[in-house]
């Protein structure tokens, strides 16, 4: 089979990717500027035209020579036997690229080339081929470089990057071939080797990245989508070979279980994306949804790849740059919090936006989207990903103070803090409490709980309702931080935050970080260690302070069984009154914390029992009897250490019966839970003397939340 030299052009920056792509097609090539060169057959060149996602033009190299003036140019073009390449009845057009030392006018070069070709045909055949700039049979390309002229015959009449599916596009369209390049560079081909590949584009625009990813996943040859594709009409063209290769490509498509999802905040753009997806025939693989990137959630079973090409700063955002930077800041937060183990690639020309992600790049590569120079930034979301030049505290302060400038609705929150503090002051003075709840979602738009721990604040955000704009909810949360700092004169570093919501993946059952900072607080005559940053809760439930006192008073100089004991705060209060205590909990961490609480209060922990066990299983085998039992189970638990899932409404009858089996006949069981819709079992009410003591156990600072817990005193009849 006859061999030729071919040059395959591409966008600057993706030459190595194109070289690798040709290797996968079985073609060895050499990297050149804006393309690659290879020796091969027409069949090899056809394969590139059909299968390449990255190529722009496949060109047969005709000749190269040094040219210093217009006569040299005419003679050089005339020296090529054009009748070996195409017939006189075939049309052609000429395109010029590059720069020449001696020719400033490319139209002049094009005219001289046309004259030389036409004159040659006329001199030999007495006929001349016609020029057709719209739909030619052949395209002749001259590339000028210094004093050299390179002549090529293009196999594809129009650029290969045009796939014909993009009927609708946004303001800043991404070339199809560049979208394919960043996908390959980001690792999509490796991702496709997984059992279920996952790709997300959280700012998908008209869907180009999504569609290119789907084409690769389904092994769809790009040329099959180009309804206007035209191969050259040269004497070297083999129509039968071309048709056979196209048929093989059609039969090579496959079914994929890849998950490819796109999100965008603009419904109009998404409508265009959806139509493009249908046009490309990949609607079975690609889904799109209207969503702000700052609300991005990981709802997938395994790690995947995020690839996106966001708007380019000033070019699209103009005077809304602050909004763009805030978007990237929120995007960085979502990646750090919810996408552990994922890989991320962001193509942008706006470096300031990348800084807002606050993530370390693993790789940077320069690409060109037309004339726009862009950078592909790649990240791996792991323990090393967080960028250190801005601490989390510094970031929180910056966002809090910026949020305070966006609206003044936080003034109402500040006024409520002042009002509540004024109302509680007499009670605080009387009791001496330094830990209390100051605010509990008193204003619906500020759905937070503010707990004061002396000079520290534990701020819990209740997860916003699905109908609430998540960005507004986030803004209000940071406004709350700002007002707590300003109104209560609390240092920013002493404001500790927590969001109550479902945890996933790496977030579950793990300490928040490695700070391991404990603080000492006072409650009545006891001291306790609390930790604001490392665990889901602080180590003490403030709403239980009264029932802890009831338990301690009842257990004075007696025996106490503390079930689901957590950090053993009730046990400490009882021990200070002379009780011998047994604390049972599944968590060794919390039991050790409890022992430290005993030591903090100068109580010999060795004289008390600390048992790590599933309380239900332990109660079933326990033979000891106790004077007082404190039973304070969680509303729901599915810990791996438990034999079964605990549901307090379903299981409280079993729990109470088992606990009563360990209670002396004249003893007292204090039962508490925080399930707001709790209903006591009629069988328990019938079997034992049960008294609801909610009102007795409700402290002054929790009066606005009267259903915060259910408390019962239970005795034998």
Swiss-Prot record:
Native species of this protein? Francisella tularensis subsp. mediasiatica (strain FSC147)
- Family membership, please give it: Belongs to the methyltransferase superfamily. RlmKL family.
What's the EC number here? Answer: 2.1.1.173, 2.1.1.264
Please name one Pfam family that this protein belongs to: Methyltrans_SAM
According to the UniProt entry, its GO molecular function terms are: 23S rRNA (guanine(2445)-N(2))-methyltransferase activity; RNA binding; rRNA (guanine-N7-)-methyltransferase activity
Stored NCBIfam families: PRK11783.1
Species lineage: Bacteria, Pseudomonadati, Pseudomonadota, Gammaproteobacteria, Thiotrichales
What's the name of its gene? rlmL
Q: Which PANTHER family match?
A: RIBOSOMAL RNA LARGE SUBUNIT METHYLTRANSFERASE K/L, RIBOSOMAL RNA LARGE SUBUNIT METHYLTRANSFERASE K_L
Write out the annotated subcellular location: Cytoplasm
Function, in words: Specifically methylates the guanine in position 2445 (m2G2445) and the guanine in position 2069 (m7G2069) of 23S rRNA.
Please identify the protein, giving its name as recorded. Answer: Ribosomal RNA large subunit methyltransferase K/L
Q: Which HAMAP family match?
A: 23SrRNA_methyltr_KL (MF_01858)
């Amino acid at each position: 089979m006859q061999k030729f030299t071919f040059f395959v052009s591409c966008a600057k920056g993706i030459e190595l990717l194109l070289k690798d792509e040709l290797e996968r097609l079985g073609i060895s090539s050499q990297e050149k500027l804006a393309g690659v060169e290879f020796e091969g057959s027409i069949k090899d060149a056809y394969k590139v035209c059909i299968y390449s996602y990255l190529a722009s033009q496949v060109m047969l190299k005709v000749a190269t020579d040094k040219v210093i003036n217009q006569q040299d140019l005419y003679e050089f073009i005339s020296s090529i036997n054009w009748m070996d390449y195409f017939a006189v009845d075939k049309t052609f057009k000429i395109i010029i690229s590059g720069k020449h030392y001696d020719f400033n006018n490319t139209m002049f070069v094009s005219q001289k080339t046309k004259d030389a070709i036409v004159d040659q045909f006329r001199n030999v055949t007495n006929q001349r081929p016609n020029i057709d700039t719209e739909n030619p049979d052949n395209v002749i390309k001259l590339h000028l470089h210094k004093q050299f002229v390179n002549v090529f015959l293009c196999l594809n009449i129009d650029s290969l990057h045009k796939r014909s599916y993009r009927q609708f596009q946004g303001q800043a369209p991404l070339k199809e071939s560049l979208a394919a390049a960043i996908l390959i560079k980001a690792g999509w081909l490796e991702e496709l080797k997984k059992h279920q590949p996952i790709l997300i584009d959280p700012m998908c625009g008209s869907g180009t990245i999504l569609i290119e990813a789907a084409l690769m996943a389904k092994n769809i040859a790009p040329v099959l989508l180009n309804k206007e594709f035209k191969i050259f009409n040269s004497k070297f063209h083999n129509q039968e070979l071309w048709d056979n290769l196209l048929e093989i490509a059609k039969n090579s498509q496959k079914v994929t279980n890849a998950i490819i999802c796109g999100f965008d905040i603009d419904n109009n753009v998404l409508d265009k994306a959806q139509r493009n997806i249908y046009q490309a025939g990949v609607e079975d693989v690609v889904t799109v949804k209207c969503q702000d990137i700052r609300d991005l959630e990981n709802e997938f079973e395994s790690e995947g790849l995020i690839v996106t090409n966001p708007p380019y700063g000033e070019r699209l955002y103009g005077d809304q740059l602050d909004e763009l930077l805030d978007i990237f800041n929120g995007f960085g937060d979502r990646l750090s919090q919810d996408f552990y183990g994922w890989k991320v690639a962001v193509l942008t020309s706006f470096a300031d936006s990348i800084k807002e992600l606050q993530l370390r790049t693993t790789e940077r590569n320069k690409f060109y989207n037309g004339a726009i120079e862009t950078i592909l930034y790649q990240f791996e979301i792991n323990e090393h990903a967080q960028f250190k030049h801005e601490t989390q505290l510094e970031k929180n302060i910056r966002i809090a103070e910026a949020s305070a400038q966006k609206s003044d609705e936080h003034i109402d929150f500040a006024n409520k803090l002042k009002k509540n503090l004024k109302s509680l002051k007499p009670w605080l003075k009387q009791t001496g409490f330094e830990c209390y709840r100051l605010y509990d979602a008193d204003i619906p738009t500020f759905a937070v709980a503010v707990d004061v721990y002396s000079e520290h604040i534990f701020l819990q955000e209740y997860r916003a309702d699905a109908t609430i704009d998540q960005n507004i909810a986030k803004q209000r949360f940071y406004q709350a931080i700002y007002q707590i700092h300003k109104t209560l004169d609390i240092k920013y570093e002493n404001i500790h935050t927590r969001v109550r919501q479902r945890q996933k993946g790496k977030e579950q059952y793990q300490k928040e970080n490695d700070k391991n900072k404990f603080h000492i607080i006072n409650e009545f005559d006891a001291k306790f260690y609390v930790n604001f940053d490392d665990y889901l809760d602080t180590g003490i439930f403030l709403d239980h302070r009264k029932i802890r006192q009831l338990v301690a008073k009842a257990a004075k100089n007696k025996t106490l069984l503390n079930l689901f004991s957590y950090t053993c705060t009730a046990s400490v209060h009882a021990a200070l009154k002379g009780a011998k205590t047994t604390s049972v909990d599944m968590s060794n961490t919390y039991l050790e914390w409890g022992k430290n609480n005993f030591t903090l209060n100068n109580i010999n922990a060795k004289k008390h029992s600390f048992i790590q066990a599933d309380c239900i299983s332990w109660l079933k085998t326990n033979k000891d009897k106790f004077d007082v039992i404190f039973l304070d189970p969680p509303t729901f638990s599915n810990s791996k250490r438990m034999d079964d899932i605990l549901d307090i409404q379903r299981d409280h009858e079993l729990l109470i019966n088992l606990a009563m089996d360990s209670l002396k006949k004249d003893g007292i069981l204090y039962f508490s839970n925080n399930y707001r819709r709790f209903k006591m079992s009629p069988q328990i009410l019938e079997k034992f003397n049960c008294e609801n003591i909610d009102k007795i156990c409700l402290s002054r600072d929790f009066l606005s939340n009267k259903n915060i817990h259910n408390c019962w005193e239970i005795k034998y009849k």
